């Protein structure tokens, strides 16, 4: 695809992905996704696969199974509720799809916290964190560039060049712009080639999507905020520790992705002095 054409389609596919994330509990028809992208169903399927390397049907199916795995590991929701919340008509349908994908049942996975869905060598060592702050956040408007692949290999430099270029072009500069990373997948569950990340700047003026840069809102609500100082290489271990805290707390995960806020400039700061806040969306158990 030519760059201009590809960027145009990226905007449309980003809208579709956001729609899918927000409607996993519903029947998701290809025709509806095509309508969201303002494309014919035939062309939509081809373009979606060209951008994401998956068909729409495969993408939705994978997201449902991986969301189920996350909820089984990190929430106390009954399997029946999980099944209905992510679009399965019956718990048996979820169990069949889960076992077909991973080789064991949802119940076996929930009861054995040592089970890994991806290869164990891809999982980082354990790490201990201080108790987080529990805060109520307002929603944040962000501009972002979506990237796919192993989280440690995300090209932050190129993404931030694009984002700051939009800030300059659209005169979005104000105090309080924040550098944020949104991570949609759990590396224990999703293959490294399919992990999705949004490199973001939180802005305080209305922005217009352009090129590969899209706009979205980070949901407000209750978050557990973990503070970490050190190399970004350890951030996955930090997130793992945050999830262990959730499992042992009086909270459970809310159906939103966690995000990281980067408090200093990695280009000018020694790795051991880099400061990051990890925001984990939570709610009281049984809410």
Question: What residues fall within each predicted segment?
Answer:
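Short, Lys/Arg-enriched, Trp-marked, Pro/Gly-tolerant hinge/linker segments that flank
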Residues: 1-15, 54-55
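Residue-level marker of regulatory loop/turn positions in helix-turn-helix DNA-binding domains and
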Residues: 5-9, 22, 37, 60
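Hydrophobic, proline/glycine-rich low-complexity stretches
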Residues: 14, 30-31, 37-42, 46
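A solvent-exposed interaction/effector surface
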Residues: 18, 42, 47-50, 54, ...
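Short helix-capping/hinge SLiMs at alpha-helix to coil transitions
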Residues: 22-26, 74
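Residues at or immediately flanking beta-strands
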Residues: 27-29, 78
């Amino acid at each position: 695809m030519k760059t201009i054409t590809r960027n145009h389609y990226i905007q449309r596919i980003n809208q579709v992905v956001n729609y899918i994330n927000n409607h996993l509990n519903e029947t998701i028809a290809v025709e509806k996704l095509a309508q969201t992208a303002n494309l014919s169903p035939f062309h939509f399927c081809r373009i979606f696969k060209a951008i994401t390397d998956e068909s729409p049907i495969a993408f939705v199916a994978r997201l449902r199974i991986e969301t189920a795995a996350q909820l089984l590991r990190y929430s106390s929701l009954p399997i029946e509720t999980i099944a209905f919340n992510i679009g399965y008509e019956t718990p048996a349908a979820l169990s069949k799809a889960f076992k077909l994908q991973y080789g064991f049942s949802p119940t076996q996975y929930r009861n054995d916290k040592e089970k890994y869905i991806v290869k164990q060598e891809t999982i980082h060592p354990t790490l201990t964190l201080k108790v987080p702050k529990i805060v109520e956040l307002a929603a944040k408007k962000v501009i972002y560039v979506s990237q796919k692949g192993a989280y440690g290999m995300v090209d932050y430099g190129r993404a931030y060049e694009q984002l700051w270029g939009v800030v300059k072009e659209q005169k979005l500069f104000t105090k309080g712009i924040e550098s944020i990373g949104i991570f949609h997948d759990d590396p224990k569950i999703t293959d490294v080639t399919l992990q999705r990340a949004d490199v973001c700047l939180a802005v305080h003026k209305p922005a217009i999507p352009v090129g590969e840069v899209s706009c979205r809102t980070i949901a407000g609500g209750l978050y557990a905020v973990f503070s970490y100082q050190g190399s970004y290489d350890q951030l996955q271990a930090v997130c793992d520790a945050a999830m262990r805290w959730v499992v042992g707390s009086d909270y459970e995960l809310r159906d939103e992705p966690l995000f990281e806020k980067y408090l200093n400039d990695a280009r000018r700061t020694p790795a051991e002095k880099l400061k990051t806040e990890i925001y984990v969306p939570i709610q009281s158990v049984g809410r």
